[in-house]
Amino acid sequence: MEPLQSNFHGSSEETTASVVAALTALHAANGGGDAMDSAAFATALDASDPLRDFRARFAIPQHGDEDGVYLCGNSLGLLPHDTRDVVQGQLDKWARGGVKGHFEEPLPWARCEEALPELMAEIVGCSPECVETEIAVANSLSVNLHLLMAAFYRPTAERNVILIEAAAFPSDRYAVTSQIVHHGFDPATSLVEVKSPATANLMDGGIIPTETIIAAIDANKDRLSLVLFSGLQYLSGQYFDIPTVTAHVHAINAAAPAGTPPIIIGWDLAHAAGNVPMHLHDWNVDFATWCSYKYLNSGAGCLSGFFVHERHATAYEKHPRLAGWWGVKFEKRFKMEHKVRALLLLSPRLVFLPLRTAHSSPPSLSPTPRRWTSPPAQLVSFAPTSRRCWSRA
């Protein structure tokens, strides 16, 4: 049976109609015998699901004596069965060799994060040739959001507004509000919210039409410094039209007089990564960040990923960034050199990888390391899964 296809970016009515049409087609393809709302039809769909084997790879919370139906992946993904063995292996290595674990296979801690960007690339839409310059895995989402804004939110007296959706996830609101205050501006005037025209209740979420977002951008374009939206709205489930909104921001920048500071477009993909198809490089997104413990099933509080388009990779003067030890290339990382600033300014690509300026080494004993080992680790499995599910999206 073919994967269900739906209209990701339409209105709520269009999306619902698209899903109903897809289910109706599946019902017909399945013979149409059992009612669409019957347990028998649901069981038949499960049996013909091309991804049905993946369920067995996870520990499913119990409901009574049976496996439950887990609908909480938006908060925390499930535990892959191989996690215990991988983490125990690293604990054994620590006990056996102490500091030698930094360089001992499998999973030497000094390099344990290096496989992750390539695995993330297909999930968020980055071509293999751009992985080195566009994707990094480090820190938490909020920390990465602050690091990205440290580089890209460069407010001036004339341009200091950040545009967000009104029902943005609280951590995003806290981050942008504190950035505005940090730069000496007032959130009352420098934070603009785009509301759903369908509801006055913030916690209802509500669908925000793409044209409403574009109208808000146009209305504030002379004051905007940054547009920061969720890729997928956590209350309403709306998958925002990332390519259209991003292209509109870039069109404004292209039409602006020479010397005008560009409006930056960034995306929080916490509820999108591993959930919906994305093509961040082709969409020309300036930056994005996401967590890994929801639909990527890495464990509570595990590492975040972030994307910066390759055109910004060496724009150090235009977008100065905060740096850290793990931003130094591996061959120089343990030489403990102190002339980093001079070397960075003279030849950044020789000293610092374009993006991987994590503040320090990654947490090698969190549940995350299972994703850096051989299959069937969850993130390794996502690549073929994404090709099978999203190839026509």
Spans of model-derived segments:
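Pyridoxal 5′-phosphate
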Residues: 2-393
